[in-house]
């Protein structure tokens, strides 16, 4: 009998809560966390830190690195992956749709407020609008909006995991 492993891809604009949710979820379901921000090139981090939005070609190498990490691990262990994945073509590039796509939906106002309060992150508040401008909301996903608190979101995802995997 072959092992079946589960992958959550958590997407959304900057400051939607991807890392916060992913860290808690990965711990709850004993999964390996792939934090998309860790795969950005130095050039991309510099560009974003300077207030310049990334374009499709800037994102390509980053998305390929995340995809390769997923492919390296998804046959061996459960995964929780964070990636803004703002466009459908980015999500398609990440690989076959054999992951559970989670869209963290927040308003521009909430994203701006959260990003202003966060410390030590390269993404400035000035780039929030550019992320919303290119966002293509997914047609098929688990949508969690800002009306839920972190614990409620994680609880929902754990429930989906248990009902699907166990």
Where are the model-predicted features located?
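Conserved phosphate-donor/acceptor-positioning beta-strand/loop module used by diverse small-molecule
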Residues: 95-114
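Conserved substrate/cofactor phosphate-moiety recognition/catalytic segment
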Residues: 23-65
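Walker A (P-loop) phosphate-binding loop of P-loop NTPases
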Residues: 15
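Phosphate-binding P-loop
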Residues: 1-5
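Loop/turn-to-beta-strand initiation segments
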Residues: 76-79
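Conserved lysine of the Walker
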Residues: 18
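Hydrophobic anchor at the beta1->P-loop junction of P-loop NTPases
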Residues: 10
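Small-molecule kinase domains that catalyze NTP-dependent phosphoryl transfer to phosphate-bearing small molecules
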Residues: 117-160
């Amino acid at each position: 009998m072959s092992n079946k492993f589960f992958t959550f891809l958590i997407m959304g604009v900057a400051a939607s809560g991807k890392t916060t949710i992913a860290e808690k979820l990965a711990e709850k379901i004993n999964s390996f966390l792939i934090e998309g921000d860790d795969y950005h090139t130095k050039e991309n981090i510099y560009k974003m830190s300077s207030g310049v939005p990334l374009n499709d070609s800037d994102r390509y190498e980053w998305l390929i690195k995340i995809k390769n990490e997923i492919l390296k691990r998804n046959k061996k262990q459960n995964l929780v992956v964070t990636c803004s994945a703002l466009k459908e073509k980015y999500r398609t590039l990440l690989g076959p749709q054999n992951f559970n796509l989670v869209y963290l939906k927040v308003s521009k106002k909430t994203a701006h407020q959260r990003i202003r309060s966060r410390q030590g992150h390269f993404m400035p508040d000035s780039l929030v609008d550019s992320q919303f401008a290119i966002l293509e909301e997914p047609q098929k996903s688990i949508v969690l909006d800002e009306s839920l608190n972190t614990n409620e979101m994680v609880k929902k995802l754990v429930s989906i995991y248990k009902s699907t995997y166990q």
